[in-house]
């Protein structure tokens, strides 16, 4: 049973299904699933949906790991295809390469004017970790996004390119310096109107660990974009709730921007509560 909500309502879905993991060979795993959902939205018509997926992961080779998943979901109003792909490869003891891709296609069966929605996110990166001292790690990443809609009333064709550098430095165990730099270019067409936007971002964070459970941070950022520039500064105190889970309370002045989503992931002046979990 699942429950999701937003600012003014809740949507519920009762689900039943089966998941299987097939160990084909050493280091090769196939995952399959089938699920039926009874959708019970707070507002709007009720409905049913069926979802099926198949995925594979190959990790027998110590040099690289490759995996992917394809999912199909159908309901009375829409059909959806969702695909993911990941490839990690060790270049040497300190360097590795990363490739990621996420694809989502949605077809509206009821409203022909809604058209089809196609989204794709492609990432290519190179990561460095100093295993000898474990004091410095860095990531250089390129991301290319496409967002296409064939809706008759509001057709859209958008492409976004993001180039970013991320670095973490630990001079001593209790101190962490984090820096990020990014460039973003957006080319969008809505109907017959085309617009372009580009921006540059610099951000940094200084974190001090008082104990293994409590820390404090100071962060700042500056973003320059077409026709505008924003900056922000903030302070945060954090506590480790359980292993790999942290809760942070911060106050920001101005607009603090993170490179993860660039202009979308921004914190305006005020108090903010943040929950982080690190997956292995």
Region locations from a protein language model:
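Gram-negative and organellar
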Residues: 1-280
């Amino acid at each position: 049973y699942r429950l999701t909500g937003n600012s003014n309502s809740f949507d519920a879905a009762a689900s039943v299904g089966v998941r299987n993991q097939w160990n084909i060979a050493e280091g090769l795993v196939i995952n399959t699933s089938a699920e039926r959902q009874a959708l019970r939205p707070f507002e709007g018509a009720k409905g049913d949906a069926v979802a099926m997926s198949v995925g594979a992961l190959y990790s027998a080779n110590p040099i690289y790991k490759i995996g992917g998943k394809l999912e199909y979901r159908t309901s009375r109003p829409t059909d959806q295809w969702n695909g993911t792909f990941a490839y990690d490869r060790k270049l040497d003891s300190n360097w590795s390469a990363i490739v990621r891709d996420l694809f989502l296609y949605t077809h509206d069966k009821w409203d022909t004017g809604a058209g089809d929605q196609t989204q794709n996110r492609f990432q290519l990166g190179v990561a460095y970790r100093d295993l000898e001292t474990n004091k410095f790690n860095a990531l250089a990443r390129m991301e290319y996004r496409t967002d296409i809609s064939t809706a008759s009333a509001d057709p859209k064709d958008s492409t976004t390119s993001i180039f970013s550098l991320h670095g973490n430095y630990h001079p001593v165990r209790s101190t962490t310096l984090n820096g990020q730099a990014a460039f973003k270019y957006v080319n969008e067409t809505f109907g017959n109107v085309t617009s372009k936007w580009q921006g540059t971002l610099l951000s940094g964070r200084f974190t001090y660990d008082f104990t293994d459970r409590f820390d404090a941070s100071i962060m700042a950022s500056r973003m320059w974009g077409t026709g505008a520039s924003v900056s922000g500064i903030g302070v945060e105190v954090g506590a480790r709730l359980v292993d790999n889970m942290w809760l942070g309370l911060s106050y920001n002045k101005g607009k603090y921007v993170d490179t993860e989503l660039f202009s979308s992931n921004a914190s305006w002046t005020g108090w903010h509560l943040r929950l982080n979990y690190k997956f292995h």
